[in-house]
UniProtKB/Swiss-Prot annotation:
The chain crosses the membrane at residues 5-25, 33-53, 86-106, 114-134, 135-155, 168-188, 208-228, 242-262, 276-296, 310-330, 331-351, 384-404, 416-436, 462-482. It catalyses: a plastoquinone + NADH + (n+1) H(+)(in) = a plastoquinol + NAD(+) + n H(+)(out); a plastoquinone + NADPH + (n+1) H(+)(in) = a plastoquinol + NADP(+) + n H(+)(out). One of its GO terms (biological process) is electron transport coupled proton transport. GO terms for molecular function: NADH dehydrogenase (ubiquinone) activity; ubiquinone binding. The keyword Mitochondrion does not apply. The gene is ndhD2. NDH-1 shuttles electrons from NAD(P)H, via FMN and iron-sulfur (Fe-S) centers, to quinones in the respiratory chain. The immediate electron acceptor for the enzyme in this species is believed to be plastoquinone. Couples the redox reaction to proton translocation (for every two electrons transferred, four hydrogen ions are translocated across the cytoplasmic membrane), and thus conserves the redox energy in a proton gradient. GO terms for cellular component: plasma membrane-derived thylakoid membrane. Its EC number is 7.1.1.-. Keywords: Membrane, NAD, NADP, Plastoquinone, Quinone, Thylakoid, Translocase, Transmembrane, Transmembrane helix. PANTHER family: NAD(P)H-QUINONE OXIDOREDUCTASE CHAIN 4, CHLOROPLASTIC (PTHR43507:SF21), NADH-UBIQUINONE OXIDOREDUCTASE CHAIN 4 (PTHR43507). It is found in: Cellular thylakoid membrane. This is NAD(P)H-quinone oxidoreductase chain 4 2. NCBIfam families: NDH_I_M, PRK12561.1.
């Protein structure tokens, strides 16, 4: 569906353009600036919801609201934007999390103009990543997003903020180069040079080039997801970032990695994905178990939540590797669910830090007595994270497991092994989450912490937490609230990828027959095809 008015351009540029007016605003201890930033974020979020309600057709798997304007025609670079079922729910998630993160940053005193400028610039970059349809445009916006995050951590972070910010920029910047290298390799192949991402997905590449490009994209997006062993920047970044920045980092930026895997690795390189899908599943299992076990040993509250994020993002890899619509649907739902859950947990971790001035769990022990409402909200959020039935985490993880169970691309033995190992991580999750709640809120009271009265969560903070918990419960009770926005698209992508299975099976029948459940059927199909020639 083409829309005459360039709504996507407006949505992408509005926060950034508005940010440039911040230096001329009257400032009284940052009050004017913070209200201005919140108003822009609310306007952007509301406008996004209105535009997609009116112009987005969830029953179509095609790109919609397409906008293409020549930018640098000499090199084929266009300002090209469009959305589909992958982009729309993630843009809406971006709007909710960023708006609440700006509202959460109400007490920023140090350089408030710069802080809110960077938050709005980061908001624009996230929208641009999900809407970009030109390879170079995607890469430029992806790189632009790194700068605000680096500054937000290095200026407003904790004691080790410079180390954490530098580690973040090194990992992500180096990883991003693989997007450019792999993408340009695809663009220059053949006689028809194109930077349009949809056109790149329609080319027929040699298998070697497709596998190399897939590996490059996997490294780039694996850093952002993150995938073990490319994850080590994340605990440091979360451990030092302020709570609002952690909300955006966990709630949206990690999802950019999952989005990239689906958009580039699945949609553009389906043949290579058949080869790499078992690798993604293995990496997903490692993420789930490693993240859960490592989280259990963390004494820093935010570092424990960071490793929890690594574990939960492993389910995204399982869903992507399942090679069917159910699994891919579950991967998308897990990204949306984790975005909400991680945002509220990191926000509440910030609430406790503002009162106790520590992230060491043994020093916060027993604060439920002074902060009962915070305790209740943190417990509810932890229940969502450990996949309590009735909350979004349960539905998303269950959908991923169903996707694996129903996949005809793997043998029963392989599927049972994967599900068993992933279930180990699921079992460990409530252990480290409930232990965290007990140690922070209900453990033995730390004497120095109770020499002063701790103020409980205030109405503004309660509103922020409930604004994230309500959709978590809504999706858990009625998943169609979320899935209806993307299930047609994920089903179409999964069908497209699954169509590459027979070709891969034909060229690798001995190995394929050992690993996959559908090999006998595909063997008959390929044999009949060969005999008919």
């Amino acid at each position: 569906m083409n829309v005459q008015f360039p709504w996507l351009t407006v949505l992408t540029l509005l926060p950034l353009v508005a940010a440039f007016f911040i230096p001329v605003l009257p400032d009284r201890e940052g009050k004017t600036v913070r209200w201005y930033a919140l108003a822009i974020a609310l306007l952007e979020f509301g406008l996004s919801a209105m535009v997609f309600w009116r112009h987005y057709d969830a029953q179509s798997a095609q790109f919609q609201m397409v906008e293409t304007v020549p930018w640098l025609p000499q090199i084929g670079l266009n300002w090209s934007l469009a959305v589909d079922g992958l982009a729309v729910p993630l843009i809406l998630l971006t709007g909710l999390v960023n708006t609440l993160a700006i509202f959460a940053a109400w007490q920023v005193k140090q350089k408030p103009r710069l802080f809110y400028f960077l938050m709005l610039a980061l908001y624009s970059a996230q929208i641009g990543v999900f809407a970009a349809q030109d390879l170079i445009l995607f890469f430029l916006i992806w790189e632009l997003e790194l700068v605000p995050v680096y500054l937000l951590i290095s200026i407003w972070g904790g004691a080790q903020r410079q180390y954490a910010a530098t580690k973040f920029i090194l990992y992500t910047a180096v990883g991003s180069l693989f997007i450019l290298i792999a993408g340009l390799g695809m663009a220059f192949y053949g006689g028809d040079f194109s930077l349009n991402m949809a056109a790149l997905g329609l080319k027929n590449y040699p298998l070697a080039l497709e596998l190399l490009a897939y590996a490059g994209f996997l490294i780039a997006f694996g850093v952002k997801l993150p995938i073990f062993p490319l994850h080590t920047w994340l605990p440091d970044a979360h451990g030092e970032a302020s709570a609002p920045v952690s909300m955006v980092l966990a709630g949206v930026l990690l999802k950019m990695g999952g989005y990239g895997l689906i958009r580039f690795n699945l949609q553009m390189l389906p043949d290579a994905h058949i080869y790499f899908a078992p690798v993604l599943i293995a990496l997903g299992v490692v993420n789930i178990i490693y993240g859960a076990l490592t989280a259990f040993g963390q004494e820093n509250l935010k570092r424990r939540l960071a490793y929890s994020s690594i574990s939960h993002m492993g389910f995204v890899l399982l869903g992507i590797g399942a090679l069917n619509g159910i699994g891919l649907n579950g991967a998308m739902l897990q990204m949306l669910s984790h975005g909400l859950i991680a945002a509220v947990l990191f926000f509440l971790a910030g609430v406790t830090y503002d009162r106790t001035h520590t992230l060491a769990m043994e020093k916060m022990s027993g604060i439920a007595q002074s902060m009962p409402k915070t305790f209740a909200l943190f417990t509810a959020s932890s229940m969502a994270s450990l996949a309590l039935p009735g909350m979004s985490g349960f539905v998303s993880e269950l959908t991923v497991f169903l996707g694996l169970t129903n996949s005809d691309a793997y043998s029963t033995t392989f599927k049972v092994g994967v599900i068993f190992l992933a279930a180990v991580g699921v079992i460990i999750t409530p252990v480290y989450l409930l232990s965290m709640v007990r140690r922070v809120f209900t453990g033995k009271q730390a004497g120095d912490m109770f020499d002063k009265l701790l103020l409980d969560i205030n109405p503004r903070e309660t509103f922020i937490a409930l604004s994230l918990l309500v959709p978590i419960i809504a999706v858990g009770m009625y998943p169609k609230v979320a899935t209806q926005t993307y299930d047609v698209t994920t089903t179409a992508i999964a069908r497209h990828v699954h169509g590459a299975l027979p070709a891969v099976a034909q060229h690798h029948l001995p190995l394929y027959a050992q690993l996959t459940q559908s090999a006998p059927r595909l063997f008959r199909e390929t044999t009949v095809a060969d005999n008919s020639l």
